[in-house]
């Protein structure tokens, strides 16, 4: 099912196993590819593991209001397991509070949140909190993907 969801709502989102029909983890952080502005993985806090684990978005069976549904906890990978994913994690790219500037180099504000389409986890819109002097006219700016 295609849904638009705010990026902030993805944090602490439950991950459910199709095999056990129970919650096996929660989303801890988002791994965003800055080249495509797309979520490529989720860092997860697994219930039965203290390792730093990730869930590749290609392993997701279904995204629903109940949670992210995957086959089992065998879908979780460690940081060094997938080379491409490891390179993106090493970048440490985080959208929250990132400065947004125009082509003319004027400050538009800072990223407050963003919306994601759940079929391929593309970031579709940035929700920008405006600086105080611009917030009087327009407190929030929504920038769509073009």
Language-model region placement:
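Peripheral interaction segments used for macromolecular assembly
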Residues: 1-146
């Amino acid at each position: 099912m295609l849904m638009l969801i705010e990026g902030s709502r993805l944090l602490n989102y439950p991950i459910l196993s199709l095999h056990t029909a129970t919650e096996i983890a929660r989303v801890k952080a988002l791994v965003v590819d800055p080249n495509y502005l797309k979520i490529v993985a989720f860092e997860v806090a697994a219930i039965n593991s203290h390792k730093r684990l990730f869930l590749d978005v290609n392993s997701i069976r279904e995204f629903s209001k109940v949670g992210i549904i995957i086959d089992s906890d065998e879908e979780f990978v460690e940081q060094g397991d997938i080379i491409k994913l490891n390179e993106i994690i090493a970048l440490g790219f985080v959208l929250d509070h990132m400065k947004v500037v125009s082509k003319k180099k004027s400050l538009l504000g800072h990223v407050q949140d963003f919306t994601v389409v759940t079929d391929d986890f593309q970031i579709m819109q940035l929700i920008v909190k405006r600086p105080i002097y611009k917030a009087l006219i327009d407190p929030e700016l929504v920038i769509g993907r073009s």
